């Protein structure tokens, strides 16, 4: 099937449910600043590429990329780009609702719900994405062959886009919403509702 275009999936989600970044209390985090060099006739020309994450720690998160000749404009562009790509993710009591894999190129990530008190067990660039999303308990692992921050962040967003809320699952399966929610609460370590 090839690589899924994460930007296209995010744009599609934004068209369905537009999110205004101005009303959210967003925090920003720079994941990576990379210096690139272009050799010209008169010498080398440096530029900087930045990957940034924004989120409100309440179910909204976005990522962006920025390039400029200096670091501060590169960061500003990355943050502005991230604010254009904010998505809403369904969380259950501070964790993800169910196990999910995300892929981008050779980066593969696994997100699993965790019981309350576990914390964010995630490494590399996955950690700031999950923290700014508002996840307090999760087990996450980079399963693929690459640890390239750009690919890992995109794979994490692919996984987040695949998450289904209890309401969506109940609708698809034709079950009662409360039954699905009680199962999700048990899975996430909360108190089951009877």
Curated annotation (Swiss-Prot):
GO molecular function: rRNA binding; structural constituent of ribosome
Keyword flag Secreted: no
Gene, per the UniProt record: rpsE
Pfam families membership: Ribosomal_S5 (PF00333), Ribosomal_S5_C (PF03719)
Identification of the protein by name: Small ribosomal subunit protein uS5
GO cellular component, one term: small ribosomal subunit
Keyword annotations of the record: Ribonucleoprotein, Ribosomal protein, RNA-binding, rRNA-binding
Function comment: With S4 and S12 plays an important role in translational accuracy.
Residue ranges constituting the S5 DRBM domain according to the UniProt record: 26-89
Comment field on protein domains: The N-terminal domain interacts with the head of the 30S subunit; the C-terminal domain interacts with the body and contacts protein S4. The interaction surface between S4 and S5 is involved in control of translational fidelity.
Family the entry assigns: Belongs to the universal ribosomal protein uS5 family.
Xref: InterPro entries: Ribosomal_Su5_D2-typ_SF, Ribosomal_uS5, Ribosomal_uS5_bac-type, Ribosomal_uS5_C, Ribosomal_uS5_N, Ribosomal_uS5_N_CS, Ribsml_uS5_D2-typ_fold_subgr
GO BP term (any one): translation
Keyword RNA-binding: yes
Subunit structure: Part of the 30S ribosomal subunit. Contacts proteins S4 and S8.
